[in-house]
Amino acid sequence: MLGTLGLWTLLPAAAQVSPNRRTCVFFEAPGVRGSTKTLGEVVDAGPGPPKGIRCLYSHCCFGIWNLTHGRAQVEMQGCLDSDEPGCESLHCDPVPRAHPSPSSTLFTCSCGTDFCNANYSHLPPSGNRGAPGPQEPQATPGGPIWMAQLLLGVFLVLLLSIIILALLQRKACRVQGGSDPEPEPGSGGDCSEELPELAELRFSQVIQEGGHAVVWAGRLQGEMVAIKAFPPRAVAQFRAERAVYQLLGLQHNHIVRFITAGQGGPGPLPSGPLLVLELYPKGSLCHYLTQYTSDWGSSLRMALSLAEGLAFLHGERWQDGQYKPGIAHRDLSSQNVLIREDRSCAIGDLGLALVLPGLAQPPALAPTQPRGPAAILEAGTQRYMAPELLDKTLDLQDWGTALQRADVYSLALLLWEILSRCSDLRPDHRPPPFQLAYEAELGSNPSACELWALAVAERKRPNIPSSWSCSATDPRGLRELLEDCWDADPEARLTAECVQQRLAALAYPQVASSFPESCPQGCPENCPAAPASAAFPCRPQQSSCLLSVQQGSGSKS
């Protein structure tokens, strides 16, 4: 019997892991076809092993070993694509699965603790497990035994390849947030769906690189467009985002415009799934605020359009016979908001968006909803996460409303960033250089623990200068608005619609007072955090409250 074999001493770089993501040892022997690397994020500790991998789809590690003549050879280690029986084990307990040759046995294990697949124990000897018998004949090159072992070796490689390909196929078919392959609306239920080839699409230059996609500037039929190119391994992320963009009625001035979806690639690179979207040459909100300051009119336009876009996303409505469900964005950040030519905002990057449960929702939209607490609690950029996401106390009983409230917290941080670059809110009309929310307190790359300590334990928020409450523009409601949006109690926060109302009242105080039925004082006091009802008619009419702000000016910083 073999004792416990420690394969590697895990490096510190691999040990610094997220408390909510399983981290496993990652290894694939040379010659193994396919890879399970796409089931997680590889932690590269150097030019060679050891490496770790943070699992994306499960909390389960696995290992595959080949025991030949009493000697163990590692074939594969990594993440499984789902939590399966055996994942509850704290240790790697190998189980024999196949006998590629009389003297060789293939063992596998699964376990559910960090790096548990680094060590394996109690591997029984391979081959004959009975009493000692006659010595095995030696394999002579070219002889029948040698040929049999060669064929069995080839069989072993093919078997491992089939296992890997099966894992990858399951992962590719997975709808984001779910545990089983299910069709998305309009997909026809076919995992191997053929996407149209976008032959007329031309790629120009890379404008942004992310974890699952690269965004290019390009042209389609003469129109300048943005191309979000996904690698073939990220088909699940592509399908999830496309499903949200293709929902009936999801067309709005302050939501990034979806044009089409298909497949293609720049030049010699492999063809992959693509989303073609409207191009916004002014770039992201973060980029714009870094480069420019704005006057009061421009700042209000950005703030009001951002709130209007989020209110539209959150709203459930029927319009012209078409149904639009409520949608939670879950990844609002100044990188995911784009600036239009008129300096208003358009919300983009719907890769983590979730369709919310609604009273009139058609059954066909069910696959776009999560199927478990882990999928609901998954969120985007840490800096903008609501306190209830940082400490995992989000209300899972009414998760739809809870996610909307979390979005409003993120909205408040974006409003603060916009207002921090407003020249009219400073006595000298010279705002300081742009900083992200919490950058002054925690720096440019805060950890989840640092954010938890500041935003949850200490209940601190970005500083609101006193000049914001006594400037010539008289924005008396700014401090109250922000505090009502980033309140530590999610139930005390405003809805996105009410934020829209209050900003409209700041932009047009005379308009808000002229329409008491549709705009009750811009909802300064009585707008509930829960969705509007007959008792709280805080639902503006497009023709009265939501007039466009006249275009202001932006000053180069």
UniProtKB/Swiss-Prot annotation:
The active site is at D331 (proton acceptor). Residues 18-144 are extracellular. It comes from the Eukaryota. Residues 1-17 form the signal peptide. It is found in: Membrane. InterPro entries: Anti-muellerian_hrmn_rcpt_II (IPR015771), Kinase-like_dom_sf (IPR011009), Prot_kinase_dom (IPR000719), Ser-Thr/Tyr_kinase_cat_dom (IPR001245), Snake_toxin-like_sf (IPR045860), TGFB_receptor (IPR000333). It is a single-pass type I membrane protein. Glycans are attached at N66, N119. Its EC number is 2.7.11.30. Its cofactor is Mg(2+); Mn(2+). CDD domains: TFP_LU_ECD_AMHR2. Keywords: ATP-binding, Disulfide bond, Glycoprotein, Kinase, Magnesium, Manganese, Membrane, Metal-binding, Nucleotide-binding, Receptor, Serine/threonine-protein kinase, Signal, Transferase, Transmembrane, Transmembrane helix. The chain crosses the membrane at residues 145-165. Pfam families: PK_Tyr_Ser-Thr (PF07714). ATP binds at I207, Q208, E209, G210, G211, H212, A213, V214, V215, K228. Gene3D superfamilies: CD59, Phosphorylase Kinase, domain 1, Transferase(Phosphotransferase) domain 1. It catalyses: L-threonyl-[receptor-protein] + ATP = O-phospho-L-threonyl-[receptor-protein] + ADP + H(+); L-seryl-[receptor-protein] + ATP = O-phospho-L-seryl-[receptor-protein] + ADP + H(+). Residues 166-557 are cytoplasmic. Residues 201-511 form the Protein kinase domain. GO terms for molecular function: anti-Mullerian hormone receptor activity; ATP binding; hormone binding; metal ion binding; protein homodimerization activity; transforming growth factor beta receptor activity; transforming growth factor beta receptor activity, type II. On ligand binding, forms a receptor complex consisting of two type II and two type I transmembrane serine/threonine kinases. Type II receptors phosphorylate and activate type I receptors which autophosphorylate, then bind and activate SMAD transcriptional regulators. Receptor for anti-Muellerian hormone. Interacts with type I receptor ACVR1. Belongs to the protein kinase superfamily. TKL Ser/Thr protein kinase family. TGFB receptor subfamily. This is Anti-Muellerian hormone type-2 receptor. The lineage of its organism: Eukaryota, Metazoa, Chordata, Craniata, Vertebrata. The gene is Amhr2.
